[in-house]
Design a protein with these regions (language model features):
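Glycan-processing catalytic domains of CAZymes
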Residues: 29-374, 380-405
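Hydrophobic alpha-helical segments, especially transmembrane helices
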Residues: 7-10, 257
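N-terminal secretory signal peptides that target proteins for export/translocation
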Residues: 1-5
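Bacterial N-terminal signal peptides
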Residues: 9-18
Length: 405
């Protein structure tokens, strides 16, 4: 009898060990023990953190130095395109030395796909293949063929395609349908789009009224397709017709990336690296470094999390958004000043959080909030403190998070 029981115990212990090993090796889909992300993040993180991407601006010859400077401000992925595979391999080698990843292409990727993918796919610095930026709907069949051809040689690395913002792609209310058509046609591991919301017209700063509608639609399609979102902040001042895109302040960068964050973004991008570093760091370098440190600190909460809902407060609500008609559980009162806030309910690891972003990129926001449950307050660097009902100021574009126990 004792030997029989002992054999059963040994068998059960072995089963438990096998199950545990299988769970441990299940990839990145479980962002932490016991929690399954609503989307697959396998191969879409960098050193256990968010991918933070700088777009273009580094020549192959400069990459040995500039990629190290890029990493210094918290950017861990470089995206660029080159004429030859030799340049691509140089950038990959230098990226590995710098400790970053790369999303790259060259002309031959599409004309000699098998050979080029064969040279790139096993390089440890390769994050993804760069396929296209802002394609038209008529490009979708061609992109489908290009992606499938690459995936036939390498299905371990994603193919990167970035989509138009809603204001630049026909009627704003048709945007969701176009994104859905793209994701239905072209195989994608994540959905990337650009929208640079902060602009100046006649010397007056504002953000595009369609911006939050863009985030709403991307979030809706991404949830339906179970795909993570990649979004942008603008780091390069430039002109477009009568619109000026200014050198971004810290408040403007925070507003863009923290709004992306609370809408569920899992990848964060900057256009372009030239706005951050050009032979020497620009005035934007330290601001980007500050924001990136916050993003990685908050990845413990937001990476792989479910964004249950998003609301807006303020005197007027952005087009396509909804107001806070009922309060999240545990909150009995919530009031904000002036421009208002983006409010997001986040669930991860069985824990519930409410994240609040000041939508004003110029001025502090007053936040008056009350609770009927135990609450932990978390700042933009992940530091925690016990909280009670309070009246606080939130700096321009900044974020504050409350864990509701």
């Amino acid at each position: 009898m004792f030997k029989a029981l002992k054999s059963i115990y040994v068998y059960l212990a072995a089963v438990i060990l096998v199950v545990a090993a299988c769970e441990k090796n299940a990839g990145d889909r479980s962002s932490s023990e016991g929690w399954e992300s609503p989307y697959d993040l396998t191969g879409l993180t960098v050193d256990g953190g968010f991918p933070i991407v700088a777009w273009t601006g580094i020549t192959a010859s400069d990459s040995g130095t500039w990629l190290k400077e890029m990493k210094g401000c918290g950017i861990n992925v470089y995206l660029g395109w080159y004429d030859t595979i030799e340049e691509v391999m140089t950038v990959l080698d230098n990226a590995e030395t710098a400790g970053v990843k790369a999303i790259l292409n060259c002309d031959e990727l599409f004309s000699d796909t098998g050979n080029i993918v064969g040279r790139m796919k096993d390089h440890p610095a390769l994050f993804a293949y760069h396929i296209a930026d802002e394609p038209s709907t008529s490009d979708f069949p061609m992109l489908k063929d290009a992606v499938n051809r690459i995936l036939s040689f390498d299905d371990a690395h994603p193919c990167y395609i970035n989509l138009y913002p809603n204001w630049a792609w026909g009627k704003i209310d048709d945007y969701l349908q176009k994104v859905n058509a793209f994701l239905t046609t072209v195989p994608q591991r994540f959905v990337s789009f650009d929208h640079y919301p902060i602009m100046e017209v006649g010397g007056v700063s504002s953000f595009r009224p369609e911006w939050y509608k863009n985030l709403e639609d991307i979030r809706r399609v991404a949830r339906a397709k179970k795909l993570p979102i990649w979004a942008f902040a603008l780091s390069l001042a430039h002109y477009l017709d009568d619109v000026t895109y200014p050198v971004p302040t810290l408040g403007q960068l925070r507003l863009q990336q923290f709004s992306n964050l609370v809408y569920g973004a899992q990848g964060f991008q900057y256009f372009t690296f030239h706005g951050i570093y050009r032979n020497t760091p620009t005035q934007v370098y330290d601001r980007v470094k500050d924001v990136n440190a916050s993003l990685q600190a908050l990845s413990k909460i937001f990476m792989g999390a479910e964004i249950v809902d998003v609301w807006h407060t303020g005197a007027s609500l952005p087009y396509g958004t909804k107001g806070l008609s009922s309060l999240p559980q545990g909150i009995t009162s919530l009031k904000t000043s002036d421009v208002g806030a983006v409010i997001s309910q986040v669930v991860k690891d069985g824990r519930t959080y409410v994240a609040i972003v000041n939508k004003d990129f110029n001025r502090d926001m007053t936040l008056d909030i009350a609770f009927n449950r135990k609450v932990t307050k978390i700042d933009n660097m992940g530091y925690k403190a016990q909280a009670q009902s309070e009246n606080i100021t939130v700096s321009p574009g900044n974020i504050v998070i409350y864990q509701i126990h």
